[in-house]
Every structure is written in C-alpha cells, then in structure tokens.
C-alpha cells in the first residue's frame, strides 16, 4: 500500500514536470502532448479506480480467506501456503521492479533538475496548466466522490448479500431441523412397529396359552371319556352276567335302543356339522394367516417407502445445497463446514435408514417364523382334534358293538326263557297226567277193595294205599319244590331285570352326561373359534387396509417417483451445465477484455515512445533538453506501463483465482451429479427388486387363494360337470365352470383353450370326409378314447 502511494505521488510529480516541460514546446507538439497527457491522466485515474476497487476486493477476499482458514482442512491450508509462496515470489519480483523504477526515477530527477534550469521561461504557461490541473483535480475529486458513492453502494450490496447468506444459512438450519424432526418421526414409527411387534407377540403367547388350555381340556375330556368307557364296559359286563329280562322289558329296551340309535345318528350329524365348521374355521384361519402375511409385507413395504421418501428428501436437500453453493460461490468458504456437516448428517441418515431396513427385514422374518409356529400349532391342534374325533368314533363303534352284543345276549336269554317255559309246561303236563293216573289207580283200588272180600286183600290194598299216598306226597313235594324253584327263578329274573334297568338308566345318564360334555366342548370350541375369528377378522381388516394402501403406493408412486427423480436429476444436470458454461463464458469474456486493455495500453506506450523519439533536436541545450525530455517521458511511460502491468497482473491473479474456484465448484457439482446418478441407479435396482418381489408375492397369494377355494369344492357337482364335459364335449361352455371349480390360473385356462383349438383344427384338417367317428367326435369326448 505504501509503495502504491509513493508511486502515485511520484506519478503526480512527474505529471507536473511533464506539464512544465510541455510549456516550451511547439503549439502542435503542445496540443499532441496535452491530448496525450489528458489521455494518460484519464488512464491513470481509471487505473487508480480499478486499483482501489481491486484492493477493496482483495481486502474482502483476504477477510473471507481469514474467516475460511479456520474452517478449511489441511489440504486447503497447504494450497493457501503454496499460493502465499507464489504471492511472496511475485512481491519479490515486484520489489525488484520497483528498485529498477527507483533507479530510473533518480535518473529522471537528475534530468528534471537540468530541465528546471533550462525551462525557467515557461512559468506563464505553467500557471495556465496549473489552472487546468486544478480543474482536473476538481474533476478527480468529483470522480473520487462518485467512486466513494459506488463503494457505498457496493458495501450496501455486500451487506445485503451477507444478510441473504445468513438467511440462507438459517434456512439450511431450519431444513436440518426438519430433517431431525423427520428422523424423529421415523424413529417413532420404528418404535410403534416394535410396540406392535410386542403386542403381536403377547397375542401369540395368549393364543399359545389358549391352545395349551384347549389341549389340556381335550386331554381331560379324553380321560373322562376313557373312564366313562371303562365304566360302561364294567356295567356291560355286569349286564351280561345278569340279563334275563321279560318280554315287555325287552321291547322297552329295544325301543330305547332305537331311540339311542336315533340319538347316535343325530350325534353323527352334529359331528359332521362340527367337522364342516372346523374345515371352514381352518380355511378362515389360513386366509387370515395369509392376510397377516400380506399385512406384514405391507408394513415392510411401508417402511421401505418411508426409507425411499427419506432418501428422496436427502437427495433433494443435497441438490438444494449444491444449487445454493453454486449461487453463493463467493460465500462458499464460510458455508463449506455447514454443507459438510449436513452431508455427514445425510450419510448418517442413510446408514440409519439401512439399519431400519435390516431391522424391518428381521422383523418380517420373525413374523414369518411366528406365523409358521402358529401354523404348526394349528396343525397340531387340528391333529389332536381329529384324534379326539377318531377316539369318539371308536368309542361309538365300541358302544355299538357292545349294544349289539347286549342284543345278542338278550336274544340268548329270551331263548333260555322260552326253554324254561317249555320245561314248566312239560312238568305241568306230566303232573296233570300223573294226577290222572293216580285217580285211575285209586278208582281201580276202590273197585278192587269192593270186589275183594278177604282181609289179606284188604291189608294188601291198605299197604298199596299207603304206598300210593307216599308217592302222592312225594310228587306234591316235588311239585312244591318245582313251584318254589320257578318262583325263585322268576324273582331272580325280576331282580336281574331291575338291575339291568338301573344299569341301563345309569348308562343312559352317562350317555347324557357325555352328550352334555360333548355339547359343552363343542360350544367352547365354537366360542374359541368365534374369538379366533374375531381376532383374525380384526387382523385381516388391518392388514387388508395396509395391503390396499401398499398396492396403491406400489401402483402409483414407484414408477412415477423414479421417473420424476430422473427428470429432476436430468434438469438439474442441464441447469448446472448451463451455469458452468455461462460462468466459463463470462470468465473468458473478462479475460479477453483485460487482454484487449493490456494490448491497447501496450500499443499506446509504443506510440508514445515512437512520437517522443521522432521529435527534432533544436540546439545543444535544446538537444540536452530534448534528451532530458525523452528520458522523462520514457520514465513516465515506464511508470505507466509498470502501473498498468501490475494492475493487469493483479486482476489476472484475481480472475485466475475465481476461475480456479469455479473449476473446483464445477468438479464438486460433477461429483454430486455422479453421486445422484449412482443413487438413481440404486433406486432403479431397488424398484426392480420390489416389483419382482411384488409379482412373486401376488402369484403366491393367488395360488394360495386358489388352493383355499379348491378345498371347499363340492366333489359331486365337479364329478357331474366332468361327466357332462366328457359326454357332450362342450369344452368352450364347461371349461370355465371346471376352471372356476378347480381354480385354474389364467395361464392354465389359456393352455387348455389352445390345446382344444389345436386338437379341433387338427381334427378338421385330417378328417376331410365325414365318418361316424368324426360325427361322434363333435358330440362327446369319449370318442377320442379307445375302450377295450
């Protein structure tokens, strides 16, 4: 700065000397010299203004560099040190040039002393020139004032730019706060997902407990049924040992058996209804399980979409940062730290999003494992239920076999009763015949007594009477014993019948209790099934809503969002390229203008030298004066050229720095564009993977739905449809029905239709002449088969 001031003072002194020298020159030479002097003064004033402006810019850049040094890294410090070394070298070269200029100035001062002695007569003209010079000074003062006003405007603009930069930094801080808020929201969603996961685990534990309780209840019921079966077996064995019923009680028992058979048929119907309900419940459970899987996949896709949205926000923020960095290139030194911090925050957000994605995948795997465990538990419960039903069926078959055995035993007892009755009738007939014979004997003996006259005959007859009475007494005793035996047998049979009736009552009561237990178990199973259905319905509704939202997002957002991102990235790339081209063109324009100014100044210097060298020499003293004047003008021209070259070099340095900054900014923007392109490629790959996964899941869902629908198909109706298809050959009419019943996929239906059309076309081409076989082929499909 001091050297510039000294050069300015020396320039002013030299200008005054030049004015004094020009007083004694010719009018033409005076006019040319005054014109040249005015031009030089204007050039000097312009160069001074430019020099001051460049100094102010250089000072501002120094301040910015001083502020940015605290934020720059080691590489920037090394670069600044290299630049400082270059500047020191330039300063040394400039100091050497200044020394040379001082030497020339000393020689010029010596020449000026000679000129003062020679040009003492030019005082009048010098006064005129001094008045002109005062006017010029006034003009210079005015220009200085205008320059100060311009500087004030520039300072105001700089303050406004500084305020805008501060506002932009505040906006970036707000955007960072928004990002933090979004990150908190993502964390909250993750916490909600974890809470939902814990609630689902609790529900799974509750369902496990319920399943265990149901299994325990089924085991207890199984034990009760076994104990009841054992009791029934014992009672049946007791009944087998004591069954001799009467006919009326046998009829009542047969009627009760018929009633029991009816009850058993009702129970079979109820069991069939329970089995149908069980199948419906299993289908509903599988459907709900599938919907749960779909809901879990929807949650995973929601998390991925949130991750994609966060990535989009990060990329948009990065683009905004890049644009703002390009707009405030001069303030980038102050904002690089903040941008780096934001980029680090964005990278941390990306890492956290990847972590969230991995956690979501782990949660999905855990959900799938839990669903598989639930499936296995459901299968175990179903197998236990089937085993219980099998055991109930076995018990029913055993009861039926035991009832058949009881009926056989009753029939045998009936046969024994018939034999006993026949024996009683035989004994009664024998007793009556014995009575008749005894009465005939008595009559015969009476006749013999009446006919006998002798005592011996009477005595013999009396003895015979006594023997007959004894025999009658014995027969009556035997009859009494037989009657007592019959009465005791009848009493024992009555007792056995009463015991059997009591046992049958106990058995019927046990059967009723078993029926009540069965009804209670069925009601409990139905209540549990209803509770499960309610829970599954709620889960199905939630997962269905999520699946619908996911499908809507998958159908609407991914392709459009990626295309929009690609278009935005392309537009940003074009915009940045255009800005780079405009900046490069502006820099090239400025460099060309400065080159033109430098070439113009060099041409003017050469012209001045030529004009000064071409001046005539008048006499010795004038020759000395001329020589002295030439030296003075040459020194002045050297000073002007030095000033112009130093200003031009300084401006070139500033332009070079600006160009380097712009190139660095361009490299940063190119790197940013490459990063954005890589992110776009990653997003495209992820979108392709998501679409593939979505297609696979959709196919699996459709296949599972078709399997579930196949399970509820009426096989008799399917059999009739297939028989009608084979009999009539109406493939076009009955193929959709078969496809609906068996849940064919669209590809399978197309294959069947293509095969049918190809077979029909082949038949029409091969069978040109009609034949019975061809006539039958149009009516049924059986004609295509050969039956041996």
Curated annotation (Swiss-Prot):
GO terms for biological process: Golgi vesicle transport. The keyword Disulfide bond does not apply. Residues 763-775 have a biased composition (Low complexity). Keywords: Coiled coil, Golgi apparatus. Residues 1-15 have a biased composition (Acidic residues). Residues 1-30, 612-643, 763-788 are annotated as: Disordered. The gene is GRIP. GO terms for cellular component: trans-Golgi network. Residues 620-643 have a biased composition (Polar residues). This is Protein GRIP. Residues 30-615 form a coiled coil. The keyword Mitochondrion does not apply. Residues 16-26 have a biased composition (Basic and acidic residues). Residues 708-755 form the GRIP domain. It comes from the Eukaryota. It holds the Pfam family GRIP. Golgi matrix protein playing a role in tethering of vesicles to Golgi membranes and in maintaining the overall structure of the Golgi apparatus. It is found in: Golgi apparatus. Interacts with the GTP-bound ARF3/ARL1, but not with the GDP-bound ARF3/ARL1. Its main location: Golgi. The C-terminal GRIP domain (711-788) is necessary and sufficient for Golgi targeting.
